[in-house]
Amino acid sequence: MKKVTNKKVNFRKQLKVKLENTATRYKNKVGFKPTPVQAYHWFRVINRGLFNSRLPVVPMYIRKLHKDWGRCVANWDNRKTPKGKFDQRKIPYHIDVEYYIELHVKFPTWKDFIDTLAHEMVHLYQMTWVKDPYANHNSNFFAWKNKFKLAGLGLTRC
């Protein structure tokens, strides 16, 4: 009988190999423009590899963002609260919260796109699972740094 923990390790190894293979394909490409299909594909891959498929599939929008590469937004009562300003203590418990991720139209490299998407997925995890009142760059956020490093991803504040 196989252990269940090996399955999780295999997903992480598969994620790392898939990221490395795709990174070599886009190695010399400057100015990566993601499509919604690519964004959803990599969301599913990272969700399965790092988050054990815990994150809900949320809408993703690719648009021009001012001063940001990406945002994880909690929309409750049409207030569209971005991460960092998200305070769950102010949200009434009977209101459903709609989450979505916004990504910039163009990234310097493919790796920047993947790192940004994974970064926003950590904020989504903070909002949906940890119920972190602020969901910003705190100890809950940086607790993912080792898992990201093992998968070959970078987790930084910006």
Q: Where in the sequence are the language-model features?
A:
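Active-site-proximal or metal-binding-adjacent scaffold patches in catalytic folds
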Residues: 1-115, 124-158
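Extended, alpha-helix-rich binding/interface surfaces that flank or overlap catalytic cores
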Residues: 121
